[in-house]
């Protein structure tokens, strides 16, 4: 296949087979947003502890929301090749639904690189906090479905997950 026919995406974090941080020096700082979601599936005993307010550590949903906000700001410390960028806005919604705890995080920046990883990290850290807060009630809690719902801005353009 000739280079002009190659439609595979470029993996920008590798050069000559070695990891690298992508150079964004020449990229324009523009408004970028990303929204991610994830779920925490609760066994009956964990759900009962949440609904009954009997978690010994306090309100799991409030702690998860705060953890998600903190996670969005600490992404570059956790995701090794992620740029430390200014998070100019973050919203983490944590709701108890029939299927479990749903977490949706939206993160905004005006930077030369996107905030998809910040949104995904916010959801993941929020979910881990739900687990931590309810693990005394059940160890069978499951974190699932962490994914990017949408992104705007940047060279790659806008994205919306097909089933949203």
UniProtKB/Swiss-Prot annotation:
Please verify whether the record's keywords include Lyase: yes
Question: Could you name the domain of life of the organism this protein comes from?
Answer: Bacteria
Keywords per UniProt: Lyase, Molybdenum cofactor biosynthesis
Q: What is its EC number?
A: 4.6.1.17
- Catalytic activities: (8S)-3',8-cyclo-7,8-dihydroguanosine 5'-triphosphate = cyclic pyranopterin phosphate + diphosphate
Q: Which SUPFAM superfamilies match?
A: Molybdenum cofactor biosynthesis protein C, MoaC
What class does this enzyme belong to in the EC scheme?
lyase
* Catalytic residues (UniProt): 132
Pathway involvement of the protein, from the record: Cofactor biosynthesis; molybdopterin biosynthesis
Record field: transmembrane: none
Q: How does it assemble?
A: Homohexamer; trimer of dimers.
Its function, per the record, reads: Catalyzes the conversion of (8S)-3',8-cyclo-7,8-dihydroguanosine 5'-triphosphate to cyclic pyranopterin monophosphate (cPMP).
Looking up NCBIfam families in the UniProt record yields:
moaC, PRK09364.1
Family membership noted in the UniProt record:
Belongs to the MoaC family.
Protein name as it appears in the record = Cyclic pyranopterin monophosphate synthase
């Amino acid at each position: 296949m000739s280079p002009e026919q190659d439609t595979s995406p470029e993996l920008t974090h590798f050069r000559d087979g070695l990891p690298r941080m992508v150079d964004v020096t020449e990229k324009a700082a523009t408004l970028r947003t990303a929204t991610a979601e994830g779920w925490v599936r609760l066994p009956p005993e964990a759900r009962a502890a949440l609904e009954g307010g009997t978690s010994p550590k306090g309100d799991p949903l409030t702690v998860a929301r705060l953890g998600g906000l903190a996670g969005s700001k600490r992404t570059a410390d956790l995701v090794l090749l992620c740029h430390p960028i200014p998070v100019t806005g973050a919203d983490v919604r944590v709701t108890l639904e029939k299927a479990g705890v749903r977490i949706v995080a939206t993160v905004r920046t005006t930077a030369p690189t996107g905030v998809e990883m910040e949104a995904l990290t916010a959801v993941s850290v929020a979910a881990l906090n739900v687990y931590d807060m309810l693990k005394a009630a059940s160890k069978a809690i499951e974190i699932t479905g962490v994914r990017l719902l949408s992104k705007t801005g940047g060279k790659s353009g806008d994205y919306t997950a097909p089933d949203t």
